[in-house]
Amino acid sequence: IEFKAKLLAQYWDNFQTEISQHLPESYQSEIQELSNNLEKALNQLIYELQNPTLTLATTGTTSSGKSTLVNLLCGAEIVPVAVSEMSAGAVTIEYSTEKSLIIYETPGALWECGEWRGISDDKIYQRLYQAMISYIENRETQPNLACPQSTITYPFRLLKESQLQLPKATRVRILDLPGLAYVGDQGNANVIKQCREALCIVTYNSAETDSQKVKSLLQEVVQQVKDLGGSPARMLFALNRIDVFRADRSWPESENRFVEKAIRDIKNELTEQLKEYTEDIENLKVVKLSTWPALLSLQIQNQDDIYSADACKKARNHFYGLIEDILEDLPVVNTQKWTRHDKNRVAQALWQKSYGEEFQQNLREHINKHFPQLV
């Protein structure tokens, strides 16, 4: 493509030189303007070919753990997570060795806006939390209030450790899209337009058992796909919170039955409403995942002993069933007294049982397969 672009520039230059000799003076400025515009467009095309940007956009159904997925991709808890819907505004995370946060000035902003460099993970989390909670609490009484828009630069794990085989000079960014309740809010529509060529990871709440709510979730999936535009072929569906089935006496049969039914239902619902993508939907990639235990696995391996012990405590309290056999083998209950060997055993078990490795591998393959379209 780069060769053809340069060839086109050469052809146009020859054509311009030839035709200019036969046109009156009044046409010369118009021809020159066309030349300048073509040169700018070709330079931009060549620059983007040499410096491609890979965008991963995250979206999901209600209470699907989308924000935890973003934190998993980053390898740190920097995006606010809550039981209720927290993703009120779009957050762009660009890869950099330096950490920074920008919260942009938006119409009527009631939260602190500005730029912070060399900021800690905890401070990023707190500032985003304050901006989002302020917006959520005031949006009904102030309908013209624009949602918060922010950009983080961060050395996220996705690029550092997941062994993505990307061309040199490829820039990578993660786009954490607003929750379904805020998709239509002022400011978010422009961000969603950026996802037309992105690889979209759609999280689905596997823990929901109510049949009416499941039907509602399927409708949400269809709506998300429609809002994002583009082909479902570039979407990766994650059946999140899949660990709930491990409590069943009939596991793994119950998990397998759920996965088969969920894939069938998602494909049927999408095919019914997006008939033009029938072939892409048939080849849809759906993976199992439990984002929180996978994230805890990474946090446990952190070299900061206090941070690591806190992650161990959360794993013990919330995911006892995943690590029961290891916990029974440990000499002490107090997580602060666990040895590095103890912590590594717990981390490995969480990573395996959360399907963290399978998710990472599928994501890597999906990016490699669709890379030309994604950039």
For the regions a language model picked out, list residue spans one by one.
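Globular "head" domains of long coiled-coil molecular machines
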Residues: 39-337, 348-370
